[in-house]
Amino acid sequence: MSSFILAIDQGTTSTRAILFNEEAKLVHYHHVEITQYFPQGGWVEHDPEEIWDSTLLCCRNVLEEASLRAADIAALGISNQRETTILWDRHTGQPLYRAIGWQDRRTVNFCEQLASQAGVLAKFVEKTGLILDPYFSCSKIKWILDNIKGAYEKAKRGELAFGTVDSYLLWKFTGGKCHATDATNASRTGLFNINQQRWDDELLTLFDIPKSLLPTVLDNCAQFGFTDLDLLGHKIPITAMIGDQQAAAVGQACIKPGMVKSTYGTGCFMLLNTGDQIIHSRNRLLATIAYRLNDTVTYGLEGSIFIAGAAVKWLRDPLHLIEKANDSESMASSVEDTGGVYLVPAFTGLGAPYWDPNARGALFGLTRNTQREHIVRAALEAVCYQSKDLVRAILNDGANLTTLRVDGGMAANNWLLQFLSDILGVNVDRSRCIESSALGTAFLAGLGAGLFDSLEEMTGLWQADRHFIPQMDPKKQEELYDGWQKAVEKTLTPAAPLLFP
């Protein structure tokens, strides 16, 4: 009997295929790094074919390494980097352009011009829960249609398909038989009305995007189709799709209102479960869909940080201050403090709660005594300060936060999580399975395949690996955070047209 679940976690810098058993225990995983392209300042792209090739390779390798066959897999689920935008030809399956990444800022001017038009901003926020920012898919689609020769005409004729990465992978897995997405990914496009749960004709007109481009929107657990026989040697049912951050919230068992998770990967994403209530933030957070099951929507309040683990990669690759990412932990702990150094990693602008697309990274407080260890520590501390920015915004929106559940690649760093607990002044719990996105995806896929009965079972499956308790004096905490706020203030650009009404 088929009893294993295959979860795809397609991220910004790598693709993973993770096998879980019927008890949602991790059995084996395989990962492949993928390339990011930076053709101009503020531009971030991927090769869609590389994304697909890496996904298929991971699936084949993880099965081989675990001595399993595709026939042993009861269900497949897909989680993905959100907002990243792909357009492809419906007949040939060929991408029209590279995938424009979620970090890409090329549409800043367009978004600012649109936001300056009377009534546009308030309407956009009310319908989508988002802000009018290059982060989301709508302006990326618009850019491709306007800048790739013949794209708009082909779209009008119904010859092109749009998808976030989940939708593109589904198309490839099913041999073009299924063009669909899920409610969480749809909610990150800027074209989906989260109140009415449908593509919004008024928003499509605003961005001049033909509706024929768009995929069908399904629940997170649904019958999305089957993998083509030729791909893995057996047709595997695809029973779940979900954006990676929402998948992590499920994997962290944040299924009750008031529960919060934070994922530390390339960026950092903090998500608060708000139940059946849409909370329009007064503090520049995003209202979004946490998950949709049986046509019932659970909403979330999210803060997005563009640069977290990417700052460590920056220390490693162009700067060569570290050899390996995990060297950052020992280097940060080897000095008592940063020596007054603050890094504001606004390499692609600043996300929540500032939403300044034109801000750029800066190092402050350098002296002749500054060592590379101080800079490395400042990079890790910056992740924690940005997290405090988000926590303050969540608290100011009326939420109560006593414990934060964390996951992602950076969550393996004990020093980082202790400093995070110290600077936030709250308990931080690290999940035993730091692959929370994959776990949440696997659980939903199993739910869709009938291996699990209800979402509540996830609560019993979640286990903490380690608890981090605040140890810093509150006065010291305030002093350090005040220095961060002053550093951020120096990087912010003159006010552009407001992105919130």
UniProtKB/Swiss-Prot annotation:
Pathway(s) of this molecule: Polyol metabolism; glycerol degradation via glycerol kinase pathway; sn-glycerol 3-phosphate from glycerol: step 1/1
The UniProt record lists the EC number as 2.7.1.30
A family per Pfam: FGGY_C
State the activity regulation. Inhibited by fructose 1,6-bisphosphate (FBP).
Q: Which reaction does it catalyse?
A: glycerol + ATP = sn-glycerol 3-phosphate + ADP + H(+)
The residues that the entry says bind glycerol are: 82-83, 135, 244-245
- State the Gene Ontology terms under molecular function: ATP binding; glycerol kinase activity
Alphabetized PROSITE patterns for the sequence: FGGY_KINASES_1 (PS00933), FGGY_KINASES_2 (PS00445)
Gene3D superfamilies in the record, alphabetically?
3.30.420.40
- Give the matching InterPro entries: ATPase_NBD, Carb_kinase_FGGY, Carb_kinase_FGGY_CS, FGGY_C, FGGY_N, Glycerol_kin
The UniProt function text for this chain reads: Key enzyme in the regulation of glycerol uptake and metabolism. Catalyzes the phosphorylation of glycerol to yield sn-glycerol 3-phosphate.
Q: What is this protein called?
A: Glycerol kinase
Q: Which organism is it from?
A: Coxiella burnetii (strain RSA 331 / Henzerling II)
Q: Identify the gene encoding this protein.
A: glpK
